[in-house]
Swiss-Prot record:
Protein name per the record: Translation initiation factor IF-1
Record organism: Granulibacter bethesdensis (strain ATCC BAA-1260 / CGDNIH1)
Record-stated family: Belongs to the IF-1 family.
NCBIfam families assigned: infA
Entries under Gene3D superfamilies matching the protein: Nucleic acid-binding proteins
Protein localization: Cytoplasm
Protein's gene: infA
Function (record text): One of the essential components for the initiation of protein synthesis. Stabilizes the binding of IF-2 and IF-3 on the 30S subunit to which N-formylmethionyl-tRNA(fMet) subsequently binds. Helps modulate mRNA selection, yielding the 30S pre-initiation complex (PIC). Upon addition of the 50S ribosomal subunit IF-1, IF-2 and IF-3 are released leaving the mature 70S translation initiation complex.
Subunit field text: Component of the 30S ribosomal translation pre-initiation complex which assembles on the 30S ribosome in the order IF-2 and IF-3, IF-1 and N-formylmethionyl-tRNA(fMet); mRNA recruitment can occur at any time during PIC assembly.
Length: 72
């Protein structure tokens, strides 16, 4: 799947879950499970509850996503 096929949303991290997973509430009031992208892990960018994030999701599974950016 190419990067152009991904859907981007903004949301807020609601809770931290085990195995580096996060519960994210999107701006459209949906709640999804998300993990951080590889570049965020490599650069040790911390994500905490209450942070605003960008999430990209595949159109095939709209319940899971990848956190690609944390707003300051």
């Amino acid at each position: 799947m190419s990067k152009e096929d991904m859907i981007e949303f903004s949301g807020t991290v609601m809770e931290l879950l085990p195995n580096a997973m996060f519960r994210v509430k999107l701006d459209n009031e949906h709640s999804i499970l998300a993990h951080t992208s590889g570049k965020m892990r490599k650069n040790r960018i911390r994500v905490l509850a209450g942070d605003r994030v960008n999430v990209e999701m595949t159109p095939y599974d709209l319940t899971k996503g990848r956190i690609t950016f944390r707003f300051k």
